[in-house]
Amino acid sequence: MKAKLGFNRLSRKSSHRRALLKNMVISFLKHEKISSTKAKLFEVKRFSERLITKAKVDTVHNRRELSKFIHDKYILNKLFTKISPVFRQRSGGYTRMIKLGKRYGDAAEMAILELVEKPLKAE
């Protein structure tokens, strides 16, 4: 019997999959909303929820741990100063997925991933 895999491989090799997820998570944290296929967004959701949970405690160690995955200093700072304080009281479920239907070309299920609560904009 085939054992269940812990994550979706997305039909890519490990280095390609890691680069794809890294880029999608960074753009999700930058724009606070992202649109893609449902399968990709499930994986992005897993990674981003872990990153937000880790960023709730602002220590040098946590910043270094997250900087291994997020190389953009602006996004890393935004995660620690604007996004994670909004979710301080929430113990999980920081994102929501809204299904859009099927894509015209190949009938892939599309969705939007967004943060549940919006961070306050600096005026």
Swiss-Prot record:
GO terms for molecular function: structural constituent of ribosome. Pfam families: Ribosomal_L17. It comes from the Bacteria. Keywords: Ribonucleoprotein, Ribosomal protein. GO terms for cellular component: cytosolic large ribosomal subunit. Signal peptide: none annotated. PROSITE patterns: RIBOSOMAL_L17. GO terms for biological process: translation. Part of the 50S ribosomal subunit. Contacts protein L32. Belongs to the bacterial ribosomal protein bL17 family. This is Large ribosomal subunit protein bL17. The gene is rplQ.
